[in-house]
Amino acid sequence: MMTHTKWNLDNKTVLPISLRPKYINKRDEPGHLEIDSILGKKNEQDSLISIVDRCTRRLWLIKSNYKNEYYTANLIYNYIVKNDIDVKSITVDNGLEFQALGITAKKLGVKLYKCDPYCSFQRGTNERTNALVRRYIPKGESMKLKPQIYLDDICFNINSMPRKIFDYKCVYDLELDYYK
């Protein structure tokens, strides 16, 4: 029987980050995603969900109108399926909005790793990428009037940036190499 804790979907789908395999940490293959929220103006429900591939650093942004965990899980699942995103694992923080994400992981047939409380450095790729998003949407700015097409443009700009870590290739160049 499942306990009432939403995180505890089962003992095989939702795992602590300490059990994440080393090969995921090495960033050798695409499909291992980090997911986080980017909050807007205080006292507003609207926020962004950022999804970042650990290997290629590809960014996807989703506008979220509510911080409800089931709404968020459904929103992420639908976005991943609609955009045919390659998913092999998911890593998230302990935010309340992600407590039902185990359901999404189970539907996708992947493992969900949750970080330790107050350890955002365990999702460093995501945190670094969120800082790039903040160049376009400063902290405290309302997300209410940001249409998805604007967020897609931000993703395109960030994904098109040459990165020193990749010998000045952009995300799209890397994906061409990986998905030949």
What is each PLM-predicted segment?
Residues 1-48:
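Mobile-element integrase/transposase regions
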Residues 36, 51, 57, 76, ...:
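Mobile genetic element proteins and their domesticated derivatives, centered on retroelements
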Residues 41-44, 61-84:
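Active-site beta-loop-alpha junctions of metal-dependent nucleic acid enzymes
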Residues 56-60, 82-88, 136-137:
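Short, surface-exposed connector motifs at secondary-structure boundaries
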Residues 75, 102-104:
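A short acidic, amphipathic alpha-helical/loop segment
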Residues 105-112, 116-180:
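Charged alpha-helix within mobile-element recombinases
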